[in-house]
Amino acid sequence: MKQELIDFLCKKSVNFSDEPSFKLVSGRLSRFYVNCKPTILHPRGMYLVGHLVMEAVKEAKLDGIGGLTFGADPVAMAAAFASELMGCPIKAFSIRKEPKDHGIIKWVEGDMQEGERVAVVDDVVTTGGSTIKAIERARSQGLEVAKAVILVDRQEGGLENVAKLVPDASAIVTRAELLEAWNKLKK
């Protein structure tokens, strides 16, 4: 299943250029860019992501899974849907980038209660900034962040930065795995 996801990502979501031409969230330019949405929002990609994320969190005894909108939303929703299919339902939640300015003011949207154990997910990590922001906001709302799962680790220190806040942090796919598959597909 993992290799199928890697191949799917290479076909739908991975971009390379000879010169650094892709602007990252950090503002830095890169030769390597991954936009996971075309993969995750495809029915087969959603199935693969959901099941692989659930495999990564199955021992954590979680109540919820989510992260910073928009990158984490399809990952969390795929995992929540897969959790129901697997007979171990976990609720999805989304963390706002800006606080809601009306109604009940909160960062976390979804049916989450203070004290519940959650995993924070993200689609891609470079520096870890977005994932760390999600972890901090989840904790500020009283959630216990027990695990962090990243779909694609660019292997630029982000996963290690996340692990400073959540020691049980892992990635489903690494940049090295994508590069290896990309090179095989190009032959």
Curated annotation (Swiss-Prot):
Q: Write the record's keywords in alphabetical order, separated by commas.
A: Glycosyltransferase, Magnesium, Pyrimidine biosynthesis, Transferase
Requisite cofactors: Mg(2+)
Residues reported in the UniProt entry to bind orotate: T126, R154
* Catalytic reaction(s) noted: orotidine 5'-phosphate + diphosphate = orotate + 5-phospho-alpha-D-ribose 1-diphosphate
Gene Ontology biological-process annotations: 'de novo' UMP biosynthetic process; pyrimidine nucleobase biosynthetic process
GO molecular function annotations of the record = magnesium ion binding; orotate phosphoribosyltransferase activity
State the SUPFAM superfamilies in the record.
Answer: PRTase-like
* Enzyme Commission number, as recorded: 2.4.2.10
Identify which top EC class this enzyme belongs to.
transferase
The pathway is: Pyrimidine metabolism; UMP biosynthesis via de novo pathway; UMP from orotate: step 1/2
The annotated subunit structure for this chain is: Homodimer.
Protein known as: Orotate phosphoribosyltransferase
Lineage of the native species? Bacteria, Pseudomonadati, Thermodesulfobacteriota, Desulfobacteria, Desulfobacterales
Corresponding gene?
A: pyrE
